[in-house]
Amino acid sequence: MTLAHIFQTIWDFGTKDSVLQPIWDYVRLNHSETLRSPLFPVVLTVSSYFVLVLPYLSCDILGRKWPAIYRYKIQPDKLPTTAMLLHCSGVTLYNHILLVIPAAVAQWMWRPPIPLPEQAPTLLELVGGVTGNLLLFDLQYFIWHFLHHKIRWLYVTFHAIHHNYSAPFALATQCLGGWELVTVGFWTTLNPVLLRCHLLTTWMFMVVHVYVSVEDHCGYDFPWSTSRLIPFGVYGGPSKHDVHHQKPNTNFAPHFSHWDKMFGTHADFRFSKPRE
């Protein structure tokens, strides 16, 4: 089998209408009221966040008692304390009560139910849409992040809370000021609309975005980390973001590496070698 034939097979599979259609038909026909609710995207992202944080939180709580996992800790001498975990939990809870829940209720009250298209996206459209949204968000947040580090007032007023800790951990992902949380939520909601994504693609992007954001802050460089699965240093991952918390004027892009390399803010990072 030639390389061209392999690529053709992958392309044909990715562009087949029928691959995702059975899944989409099932959820659309059996759970339409839930999916059409303006509350659904909010519930999806919030629940995804807490579910995805839990495994990393377990790693932080068990710490050195779990050597098979602890050997992948990027900064092994800096485990989050109980006080740090409680502080980040409190900030996250405060933001959700003050900002996320009221915004969700407002959408539920004033936004009409969302129509569900009958046709599912192709697999290629789904993957391309998720990737496109991540790349667009990466540019937006790179600019926002750069400005909030370079302009002192912006940093102190809005972003400094996220840099309370030089060694990131999963619960610190949403240890954010209200302005930053609103900005991130706005882009996450707007970008799929700008890219005219299918609803299934939009929801998949939201879950993937939550996952990679939590992974970036987890403080562990596992063999299955996204940055190790994507070759050529295109994707930064937890090691890259860990360096940002140690050297705050570097590595501003949240996920990928190209913007920092283009604008001279890239700081080299080494993938952690597991300790024996």
UniProtKB/Swiss-Prot annotation:
One of its GO terms (cellular component) is endoplasmic reticulum membrane. Keywords: Endoplasmic reticulum, Glycoprotein, Iron, Lipid biosynthesis, Lipid metabolism, Membrane, Metal-binding, Monooxygenase, Oxidoreductase, Steroid biosynthesis, Steroid metabolism, Sterol biosynthesis, Sterol metabolism, Transmembrane, Transmembrane helix. A motif (Histidine box-2) lies at residues 159-163. It is found in: Endoplasmic reticulum membrane. It comes from the Eukaryota. The keyword Nucleotide-binding does not apply. The chain crosses the membrane at residues 39-59, 90-110, 126-146, 175-195, 199-219. It is a multi-pass membrane protein. One of its GO terms (molecular function) is iron ion binding. A motif (Histidine box-3) lies at residues 240-246. Its EC number is 1.14.99.-. Glycans are attached at residues 30, 164. GO terms for biological process: cholesterol metabolic process; sterol biosynthetic process. InterPro entries: Fatty_acid_hydroxylase, Sterol_Desaturase_Related. Its cofactor is Fe cation. A motif (Histidine box-1) lies at residues 144-148. Residues 134-265 form the Fatty acid hydroxylase domain. It is an enzyme of class 1 (oxidoreductase). Pfam families: FA_hydroxylase. Belongs to the sterol desaturase family. May catalyze the formation of 25-hydroxycholesterol from cholesterol. This is Cholesterol 25-hydroxylase-like protein 1, member 2. It comes from Danio rerio (Zebrafish). The gene is ch25hl1.2.
